[in-house]
Structures are given as C-alpha cells and as structure tokens.
Amino acid sequence: MRIRRNSSLDLGRFSDPSLLILSSLASGPKHGYAMIQDIEQFCGTHLEVGTLYGALARLEKQGWIEALALVERRRPYQLTQLGITVLREQLATMNQVVSTGQQRLATI
C-alpha cells in the first residue's frame, strides 16, 4: 500500500485507504481522480492510483460501494446502504478511540 502524506506525523499502517474512500463517497458519487483530490483536501493524504483502485475493487467485492455508468470515460462509484452502515460503525469506533486517547493524554 502506497500512501503519501503531507505531514511528518505518518501513521503508516494505522491509516486505512478504505475508510478514506468511504468517507469521500459519503458526500456523493465520485470517480477515482475526484476521490484522490477530495481525500488529499480533507485529510492531507495522497492515495496512489494503484492503492485507490485496489481498494475500490475490494470495497466493491464486499458490497460497500457500487460502480455507476461511465461518465465521459470515467467510472464513478457510490456508497451502498451496507457501505453507509459500515462507515457509520467505523467512525463511531474511531470516535471512541479518539475520546479515550484524548482522556489518557490529558493525564500525562
């Protein structure tokens, strides 16, 4: 997995391209390049093309996203209902991790 970050605070394997893609698609259908731009804008992470399309294939196979009809030679994707549920659950878990981490950091 190749992800380039604009920050020296690189979490490496703690960063999940699937979560970034699902979060990007939460604002509506997008094609690959639009997702790369959106993800870079909202979190400063640049997904490499190979990483993006590998993750898209896995997400589609899991039924979390679906491909739409081509638009000007570009294939947009959108979240499925299952994908929305998965994203909500993952974000709730992340919120709990953030809350716990912040509480624990406050004690040191």
Stretches with model-predicted labels:
Residues 72-91:
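Basic, amphipathic "hinge/linker" alpha-helix immediately C-terminal to the N-terminal HTH DNA-binding motif
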Residues 1-4:
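Long, low-complexity, charged/polar intrinsically disordered regions in eukaryotic proteins
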Residues 88-108:
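Amphipathic alpha-helical dimerization/coiled-coil segments
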Residues 60-71, 78:
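Beta-hairpin "wing" of winged helix-turn-helix
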